[in-house]
Amino acid sequence: MKTMLDTIRPAEDATPEQPQNQAQNQVQHQAQNQAQNQAQHQAQNQAAHADRDQRTVFDLDLIKRYDQSGPRYTSYPTAVEFDPAFDAERYAQVCRESNASGRPLSLYFHIPFCDTVCFYCACNKIATKDRSMAQPYLDRVYKELEMQSALFDSDRIVEQLHWGGGTPTFISQAQMRELMDQTRKYFKLADDDHGEFSIEIDPREARGDTVKLLREIGFNRMSLGVQDFDNRVQQAVNRIQTEAETMEVLEAARDEGFRSISIDLIYGLPYQTVDGFMTTLERIIEVNPDRLSIFNYAHLPSRFKPQRRIADEDLPPPEVKLDILQATTERLTNAGWLYIGMDHFARPDDELALAQRDGTLYRNFQGYSTHAECDLIGIGVTSIGKVANTYGQNRRELDSYYEDIDNGRLPVFRGIELNRDDELRRDVITRLICHFRLDFADVERHWDINFADYFATSLPKLDGMVEDGLLEVDSAGIRVLPKGRLLIRNICMAFDAYLEAKKGPIGFSKVI
């Protein structure tokens, strides 16, 4: 029976003989030119058919069959593999060595505080009504900024910046301004036209004047947490948020010139129905944000204490969750939205959709991005950074984070230094997640490998997916088909060496 390996491996007798004279050299040169022209034509043809290539089809039978647990691949290897052997000392050494590359920088700030706890939340957060907790935390963040900045050359530009949480808008307007001022004190930020500066906003914590301030201090993108407008659902998850609050922030963002507005929804929450969720979705479509994130609620009460407040019997059954996802996917695609991947949709003219068509889209801990070559510095409790071929994570408990900072120590407590195999597999997984296609020759040139030989144990795992119409594999590469786009995590798992080594439950959320 013919397998993927048979499809992409050339026959042994197909190796061309070496040219013996000038005429043969000329023939070879002409062949190379012809191949280059064909490649250029193929690239132009791909661009011309971009809309067709970005279609997404929801196949319920396939979704059910492939609905398993798996990583989200915001990193590879995933954080499960991080090790305390990679400590602050090694992290600092890697950062200094990275200056030779001259790569631009990306900054992620974690602001962990929330006024109230949302019962569905799996983020690292501190629920408190005490706003006075913010300043001692920010004072430590400023000290960390100083320590981190000392590791990087001052001419390395910050092209990407993100405030996440928690709830970044928990801090006061004066503290927001101060945090951005301190950031500019220690790092050089790109100008507004080139920088991607984003913030996560809880509309209950922001009003028009807050949005005006955020634009003034440099933010040009935002994501709004909505989840669902249905009042019964909101009460069940302890997040009461009116539609008017959301619309006020969205309209203010447009008035102030924010270049990208994203809205987050969650399906699978208590009491959700197809009709109820579609009512929320229709209202969101009417206001036409630039991007939408449709997240699957992963109910893991044994790991996340707030989720214990959600009764299992109040959750929609699996078939209803799938019905919600199907209705949402079909409604958005029929309305002209493109499925970027990993729960994200965008309008065809959005920069993420354009970057995906151009082959320049990237994915990291901050989600999809158009800034691929940045070294990412994580600032604040539990933040994760990516510098050169390493990942490093800060302390996850506030007290230990404070202790490190107060003693003049970088708070990095674990991480991983990628070997060549890790880097190669990360490249393959990133290409698939971002572009839904893989060019074998390009990977072979970049990594000096024979793809079929190197991935001899991975490629056979795709056989069943090919038969099911999720993807196509030939001697040129892999192309994910419309039915396979929603199952891209399953496809990437075939190239994950760490999953091969695991036995028993792997502890990740469901892919759908």
Where are these regions (language model features)?
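Short, amphipathic alpha-helical interaction segments positioned at domain boundaries
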Residues: 485-512
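Amphipathic alpha-helical substructures
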Residues: 455-456
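Flexible, acidic/Gly-rich N-terminal and inter-domain linker regions that tether
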Residues: 1-105, 154
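Basic amphipathic alpha-helical segments that dock to polyanions
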Residues: 443, 460-468
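C-terminal scaffold of the Radical SAM
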Residues: 3-10, 97, 104, 127-151, ...
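Short, cationic-aromatic polyanion-contact patches
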Residues: 233, 357, 478-495
